[in-house]
Amino acid sequence: LCKEKIIIGSFPVLFFGFIFYDHISSNLRSIEIISIFTILIALVLLMVEYFGKNKKDITDITNIDILIIGLFQSIALIPGTSRSAIIIIGALLLGYNKKSSIVIALILAFPVILLAMLYEIYLFDFQLINIDIVSKSIIAIVISFLVSFYVIKYFIYYINKTGFYPFMIYRIILG
């Protein structure tokens, strides 16, 4: 995806996240909401995978499609909603194949997670920061990046073999 499409796909969640941050933080963090959305996303993913006709490739993505996928990503602001799963659902509904849907979810993860982290740092009490916390955070970020880089290839291979069914079952049990 080009930078323009990444910005378009990231804008809705950043916009709605900024507007509804306080409401979400104070009103939607109950165990009931989290459980309901954990199960609901699994069931929606099941239906989309079962009924989807997924032929489009990531190279076919339009600005409108990436904006719609970005709007789907906004649903992930609700606790219990997997950001990756909701993007995959949106992409599958628009006719993209599994591999492209996963790649779109992974590409859109970076700006959103980075900006969310920066916003949380902005809200953080800086008196609590010390060199130990900073060094451990940097190590965690580097390790996460490296592990993610190697897992992505396996994940795409695995999903193409099994589909999303193991993850649906996991989410239903978890919910």
For the regions a protein language model found, what residue spans apply to each?
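Multi-pass membrane proteins that catalyze or facilitate reactions on polyprenyl-/lipid-phosphate substrates
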Residues: 1-175
